[in-house]
Amino acid sequence: MAMNVLQSPSRPGLGKVSGFFWRNPGLGLFLLLLGPLMWFGIVYFGSLLTLLWQGFYTFDDFTMSVTPELTLANIRALFNPANYDIIVRTLTMAGAVTIASVILAFPMAWYMARYTSGKMKAFFYIAVMLPMWASYIVKAYAWTLLLAKDGVAQWFLHHLGLEPLLTAFLTLPAVGGNTLSTSGLGRFLVFLYIWLPFMILPVQAALERLPPSLLQASADLGARPRQTFRYVVLPLAIPGIAAGSIFTFSLTLGDFIVPQLVGPPGYFIGNMVYSQQGAIGNMPMAAAFTLVPIVLIALYLAFVKRLGAFDAL
């Protein structure tokens, strides 16, 4: 029995177009990326450059209005003692949170990478990522209750007999305060809690790629555990540490909610941008402050790139 095969009509025009793009793959790739690149360039970079350009505008303190007269007064104002203290305060906190995140994240990441598998590894992944599923503001407000006077933290320390130690610690000028929720230590703990998962996961991924044969070879050659860690594990984990530090450093640097809810009085860069733009209406000064984290993060990215951070992302 004969079988009739239906053939779709040929489309010579479509064949020519596909053949043209086959012979010119670069053009096809360009057209494929043209839409996303235009969106990224116009919406993201366009709005960012517009904001930064306003940092050179003039703000009239008398009329509270912005005029498009170019000036460097806003940039020079960043180096005033009060504004300089804000930059140093923010940079110090970002560095402290990053260092503490590395210290806390490494043991957990090492255990997850070397000693867990199957359901146990899935449990640790969920445990690390679970706080990230909650609202950022909810977590910040929850910590204000935990650290408040007569809160859970103080109750716990009281039952451990450590309340006098806490009282003595809160009298220190740089980290202390009336309560944990109004102290620099409390602000540091909230930052550390919120951004710690962003350090654990990249470090764990870097340690996961560490071949067990290297550890065995190091032991066979007579290296002590401390030497193995220093000369084998740590160099291979540095890209993951650098990748995690990008998140912890930059996110702390630009945060304005935690400094507003927890800790002693004192502006951070994010608070200053919000205050200048929202409360005062001084958009040029807010834009000038926006330039500070951009420059700092760009310098930091250039530094961690040399450590292989982008290869570990």
What are these regions, as identified by a protein language model?
Residues 2-53, 121-127:
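N-terminal signal-anchor/first transmembrane alpha helix
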Residues 34-44, 130, 193, 199-213, ...:
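Transmembrane alpha-helices
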Residues 81-112:
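Transmembrane alpha-helix signature in integral membrane proteins
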Residues 9-11, 23-28, 55, 60-62, ...:
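Interhelical loop and adjacent transmembrane-helix boundary motif
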Residues 18-22, 140-192, 226, 263-264:
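Membrane-interfacial helix termini and adjacent extracytoplasmic/periplasmic loops
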Residues 51-54, 60, 195-200, 240-274:
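Non-cytoplasmic
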Residues 108-143, 215-216, 229, 238:
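Cytoplasmic-entry segments and transmembrane alpha-helices of multi-pass inner-membrane transporters
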Residues 2-13, 20, 57, 204-215, ...:
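C-terminal transmembrane helix and the adjacent membrane-cytosol boundary/short C-terminal tail
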